[in-house]
Amino acid sequence: MIHEDDLCIDGEVDSTDLPSGSGAGQRAYFCIKCGVYIYCKYKIAEPEKRIALRTKTLNDHNRFLPEAHIFVKDKDPWINLAGFKNCFDTMYDREKVWPEKSIKRLKEKIC
């Protein structure tokens, strides 16, 4: 998750509305040339301007390791999450899971 103001994209994107685990929905944004899904805005996070960014779309994507896996109850059986400590059947409480510096940075952005 990053703050919307911290994202800069080269090129054009389009978007579509999709369902989400919360039931509130999300808007997914994708490259108009190749169709790759880049990020989404969850409707429940709109007031905070948080977006979920697909880190593999970044030039330096290897710097970003997952800190949590969500909705693992719906994962495909061939996905192996053994060894990952932060796996959740549904969403998690970010105050309990996120690193303190990430929570602080988010709070600074939304205040």
What are these regions (language model features)?
Residues 1-111:
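A short Gly-Trp-Pro
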